[in-house]
Amino acid sequence: MSDFLITESTLEKTPVTASNIRVRKSFAKNKQVIDIPNLIELQKSSYEAFIQKDMDPDRRGDAGLNGVFKSVFPITDFNNTASLEFVSYTLEPAKYDVDECRQRGMTFAAPIKVTLRLIVFDVDEETEARSIRDVKEQEVYLGEIPLMTANGSFIINGTERVVVSQLHRSPGVFFDHDGGKNNASGKLIYSARVIPYRGSWLDAEFDQKDLIHVRIDRRRKFPVTILLKALGYNSEQLLEYFYDLDEVYVKGGKLFRKLDIERMSGQRALTDIVDPKTGEALVKAGRRITRAIVKKIKDLDITELDVLPEDLEGKVLAKPLIDESTGEIIADANAELNAAIIKRSIEAGIESFFMIFFDGLTVGPYLRNTLLVDKVSNKEESLVEIYKRLRPGEPPTLEAATTFFGRLFFDPETYDLSEVGRIKINHRFGISMDECPPSHRTLTHKDILSTIKTLIDLKNGRGVIDDIDHLGNRRVRSVGELLENQYRIGLVRMERAIRERMSLQDVETMMPHDLVNAKPVNAVVKEFFGSSQLSQFMDQTNPLSEITHKRRLSALGPGGLTRDRAGFEVRDVHPTHYGRICPIETPEGPNIGLIASLATYARINNYGFIETPYRKVEAGQVSKDINYLSALEEAGHHIAPAARDEAGNKAIQTATTITRRDGEYEIVDKDKVALMDVSPSQLVSIAASLIPFLEHDDANRALMGSNMQRQAVPLLRSRAPLVGTGVERLVARDSGTSIVAQNDGIVEEVDASRIVIRRFAKGGELGANVDIYNLTKYQRTNQNTCFNQKPIVTVGDKISKGDIIADGPSTELGELALGQNILVAFTPWQGYNFEDSILISERLLKDDVYTSIHIEEFECVARDTKLGKEEITRDIANVGEEALKDLDSSGIIRIGAEVRPGFILVGKVTPKGETQLSPEEKLLRAIFGEKAGDVRDTSLRAPSGVYGTVIDAQVYSREGADRDERLSLIIEEKKRKLEKDLAVEQNVIKNNAISKLRDILVGKITTGVLLNEDGSQKLLNKGQEITEADLETVPFELLNYIPLEQDLEFQVNKIIDNARNQLDAVKLVFNEKIDRLRKGDELPPGVIKMVKVYVAIKRKMQVGDKFAGRHGNKGVVSKVLPAEDMPYLADGTPVDMVLNPLGVPSRMNIGQILEVHLGWAAHNLGKQLGAHLEKWNAENARTEMKDIFSDSDISAKLDKADDASLKSMVQRMKHGIHVGTPVFDGARESDVKGLLAKAQVPSSGKSVLFDGRTGEPFTNPVTVGIMYMLKLHHLVEEKIHARSIGPYSLVSQQPLGGKAQFGGQRLGEMEVWAIEAYGAAYSLQEFLTVKSDDVAGRTRMYESIVKGENILEPGLPESFNVLVKELQSLALNVELMESDILRDQDEDFGDEEVIEVEPVAPVASKDEPEQH
């Protein structure tokens, strides 16, 4: 067996014939080396590391939430007289469980309590020594922190959300150049940037004149030497650090220069270099010194050369020249030598000159020139200068400047490189971990000097710049880290408030809780979950979309990129993405490449870098060791692809092999190979690895295919694909939509809403060995699809841990099942497949193949208004009994009622404003009581387009409010369900205890008599041998009163006590839930009662729905054709879908054709197997199945299977055997042909098709087969709506747009041209006036329609008035005047309106044109 098609471990425990297991024939050639890790581990482990919920406070360390508290505390007041210290924190259990939070619109969160210690000191005024006066410790409530559900999501205000991991630039140092863009000559401008995790950025860059400048936090730049001098270095030290020195010394009145042999190669000789023995010139002055000459000089042991004084002119001094007799400085460091200085120095008896070496070729004078520009001379001036630049307007004092500079880069409170940043800097500059450990998280002087030195080296042509898209320079911030940062922001805000409180009030009388206000922390966390760009509404269309959402990596978000600024390089696929980020799955459109998905086997290490697994290879031998490596760690290694090896060899079989190394492909000897991929599919993400034959699809289409699988709607009857890849099982397991058995056991009880499994005892372990799994029934998801679980086990089934026992939405037998296996034909049909349209058989509609259930939630809230309370009631004025027929006495619609648009779901009345009543009305009201006139009907009605059935209604009311009948019923129902759960749990606990007692007691002798509770009856006699029947007569309560020998009695008591403890615990949980039901609900302020009504809508497939395959082949249904008119096969089977063959060649997604062929073979093999059912012969069936599966493991299992289970297995396979063809390791063309031959169909995969209308065969054979087609969430019913009249925009008075606003269709410029082209003038006038924004005309039109007249009287469109107003706002006084002059001239003109424009602007001069 191979590649995650039922793993062997599953098979060992569970027979292949089990009803809840699907066996796939695998085409994989590679044995699976390593299991795919849990798919949502990324989210769960990150959050666990942050919250450390169940960890002992002492062992929490400096990570996560504990680290945040430790970094902010202790907080001292301004005078150092008090200190508030952090001791530990505890998380209490969440108040509501996940389901309750979903229903009530609450946040699933745990209250957090922090133990703080307040220490008050006495300060001696003279010595300023502190002594502790008082210590107070107290637990302080710090609000709530949202908890992650078992599936890796959060529930915030009742909706499920996911925090997406962010891909951002790793902290550290980066070197780059501008690519020559900023200079006409293409000269490269180099720059360096030190990015901390938090704190000020430091940029160093060259300018056009080759001087080095720095910026702090992208402010104004200043020469780098000012920064270096502020660190305490002077010019002399800087020149010595950045340059090699040349020494020239005076000896016997002559000048000699020391030779630096290592540096001479490639230089020009200043003077002739002569062989001292022969006097022969080795190289003439001005000539270049080659390597050969350098070797000669070495051999001849020449160490010095004589120089003339004029040779020194123009050289730059590294150290000052000082006349020792007078102490006078002849020339300072960095001064240029000239004849006068040289002469004077020699006269003053200076013995040696130190000069800096630069030749303008391999070493440039950049730092020396920068020193000349910089005007400051010492550390103090530098500090003040930097302070002035960064804090303009503040008085620069030395003290302030020193503190400010220290806090910029060297104070752990304000500057944090993080461990990652420190490791990256050490790695870049070759600093050892001993010299600077990861715990040193601020900059050092050496870091800054190394940065400048490396920058200068780059400019001099040594070293390479960094690639910022390399995954060694990008890291992932997961949930835990994002939340940690938010919590830190909140705590820092809180810290300020605490400091102020400490100084304002008397600390001695205060307790820690008086100082702490948790609001800022809670506000920050709430804002992060509610409105951060990375906290997203979970995509819950189907299990795959959930999993993909949790595994998503986004480069957007706070501290990341923005869509507009991101270039092509960032979005592109990088060689380091291999096995870490999927190159295929990314959205189309503006986010392409910015949002990616984690590859199948990838994981994220402690530093946030993505790692991928490799097998170790030594001397061509592949070992079992698996190494997870990050992009930096794999650099320089030769990595071989996973060999396609059927024999399972442990060594590479060829002498040379193709390998990857640093993004390049090389063919090398097998001995050089260091690593090997673990699986061919480690390259792609989960969604892409669900596409069979992905290797035959063009990347663009594969991208669409993996994206469209996420939009597939869960169908009424899910069917797993005949042609899968084997990953289907994993998605179903890890998404949390299916139910996975937690322990081995036997199924005790199954119904639609719960499964009870009795656990096997492990090593005689005591305890209530029972697992109760409650199934979710018809729950609404975020995308309004239906979440429903159904059991796939029966009573008595043996279950192994990890087995799937209930299917969720879009899963079948524990495998992901997004669509249906459909018989398709590729042929044109009457133009109905034009532009990717799909022709569909009516059979799919009749059999509900593509019917899905969608659940809409409607909410009605009764508030307490200023005019009085709103009321939810059945008693609504002016509404007929017909409209109220489905409402119960409380005014809420009954469950099971059919709903259409406009139906009342919840009756509600709202008080109207009090009107002045006439005396007569007052009298009538006094006589006849309240009139219904003071309330208006504000009932919740079903919106347009909703045709469905009410499946649930939930009522929530405040504590103390009167309970209506419906609420009481709901509470009773919930109570009954809880009691039933309790009874089941208690029964199983008792039965379990009894079964253990049975093992101990049967056959043992009693030592006394046992009476029943009231003593009226003997249950057991003295000296009686206990039988199973005897035990059944003893009530559970009396079991530990059976008189026995002492050690037996001890064992019995232990079992009974254990059972009682468990019964008590279960009862306690039950009581808590019952209390909560009785209490009433937490509702937002001002809300008295809230009703939620859930309506299930059945959406059948229809024309206009969007369908897609898994290869990016999408289309829209163009016609539903009666089955009898569809093309049919020779045996009379009509096809289900007709697709356009022209959709394949240009799109280059050939995978779909291979899928169709393989599906056709699998389908026909299933039919062949099914034929055995008519004349059942177990041996024949077994032989044929062994032949089909051709896998030794499965064959062995089939041999063991009995006839009945074999028959049920064949029964399940009669519509097709399921095959698995893993990505990049699946069926080859020969395999497909072989299977077609086994299935006895033509190996071309083509069949003769007949026209269903005429019965004539088509001219050519047609490709027919099984394709897996998905119905996507873009349903035409949810998109189309109709409007005659409706809401209008306030300003322009034109109809609104969009379905949500019940808007109209826009008639744009081009549509106007089209109508003009037809000459339909009156229709056009009607469109542009009375149908749109001619307010008066609209009313007149309505009147004339009511009167039955046919008159169109258009007036002035409102948009014209808007235009006039806009012109007036430009100070052009445009007025509309009706002129009588025209009317006098000609009566027939009708009501003409004349516009006169008079400028309000100043009178135009002669030169200017007049303004109108």
Swiss-Prot record:
- Role noted for this protein: DNA-dependent RNA polymerase catalyzes the transcription of DNA into RNA using the four ribonucleoside triphosphates as substrates.
Q: Which key words are in the record?
A: DNA-directed RNA polymerase, Nucleotidyltransferase, Transcription, Transferase
Enumerate the SUPFAM superfamilies for this protein: beta and beta-prime subunits of DNA dependent RNA-polymerase
Q: Which organism is it from?
A: Bdellovibrio bacteriovorus (strain ATCC 15356 / DSM 50701 / NCIMB 9529 / HD100)
Gene Ontology, cellular component aspect: DNA-directed RNA polymerase complex
Catalytic activity, reaction form: RNA(n) + a ribonucleoside 5'-triphosphate = RNA(n+1) + diphosphate
| Biological processes annotated in GO | DNA-templated transcription
Q: Which InterPro entries match?
A: DNA-dir_RNA_pol_bsu_ext_1_sf, DNA-dir_RNA_pol_bsu_external_1, DNA-dir_RNA_pol_su2, DNA-dir_RNAP_su2_dom, DNA-dir_RNAP_su2_hyb_sf, RNA_pol_bsu_bac, RNA_pol_bsu_CS, RNA_pol_bsu_protrusion
This protein's record includes keyword Nucleotidyltransferase: yes
- The record's EC number reads 2.7.7.6
What are the recorded GO MF terms, alphabetically? DNA binding; DNA-directed RNA polymerase activity; ribonucleoside binding
**Record's protein name:** DNA-directed RNA polymerase subunit beta
The record's subunit annotation is:
The RNAP catalytic core consists of 2 alpha, 1 beta, 1 beta' and 1 omega subunit. When a sigma factor is associated with the core the holoenzyme is formed, which can initiate transcription.
Family stated for the protein in its record: Belongs to the RNA polymerase beta chain family.
| Domain of life where this protein originates | Bacteria
